């Protein structure tokens, strides 16, 4: 098992989207916007990853399961899910406007597509969903749910 810190993950359509970036970069804000659009929280500020032989499964860490920080509100509890990791978005204000192809990133021995991603605009959740659909790993045949 691998534990990633300072990352947030959500499940969309049965696949996990991992969001990384420095503190205050908008990871939780993007996750909340995606949750508002129907995604489920996997983990905020930490995510467990387990290789199940076919995919890398992202799941909530037990010590913060279901908890997410909402700036200016506090810590709230939300429903959680687990899902195969399909895409990593790295929040970067200097992300190129038109990335040609996602880079491949090896996490716990599994190659995962990774994209730089400009944070903070009004449609970032919609852009993240399109990035997952366009660049993410295909949906594996696993028992993971959204």
Question: Which positions does each model-derived feature cover?
Answer:
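Hydrophobic/basic alpha-helical segments enriched in Actinobacteria
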Residues: 6, 11-21, 48-61, 118
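Extreme N-terminal, non-catalytic leader segments
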Residues: 1-15, 52, 134, 139, ...
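Conserved nucleotide-sensing/catalytic segment adjacent to the nucleotide-binding pocket
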Residues: 36, 40-93
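Short secondary-structure boundary/capping segments
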Residues: 2, 9, 77-81, 103-107
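Conserved NTP phosphate-binding and transfer environment spanning the P-loop NTPase/kinase superfamily
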Residues: 82-146
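Glycine-rich phosphate-binding P-loop
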Residues: 14-35
């Amino acid at each position: 098992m691998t534990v990633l810190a300072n990352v947030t993950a959500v499940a969309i359509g049965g696949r996990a989207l991992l969001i990384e970036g420095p503190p205050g970069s908008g990871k939780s804000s993007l996750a909340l916007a995606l949750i508002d659009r129907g995604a489920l929280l996997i983990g905020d500020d930490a995510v467990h990853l387990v290789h199940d032989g076919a995919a890398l499964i992202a799941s909530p860490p037990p010590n913060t399961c279901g908890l997410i920080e909402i700036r200016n509100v506090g810590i709230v509890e939300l429903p959680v899910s687990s899902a195969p990791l399909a895409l990593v978005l790295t929040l970067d204000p200097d992300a190129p406007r038109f990335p040609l192809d996602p880079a491949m990133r090896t996490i716990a021995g599994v190659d995962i597509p990774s994209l730089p991603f400009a944070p903070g605009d009004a449609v970032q959740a919609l852009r993240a969903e399109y990035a997952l659909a366009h660049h993410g790993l295909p949906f594996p045949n696993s028992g993971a749910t959204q």
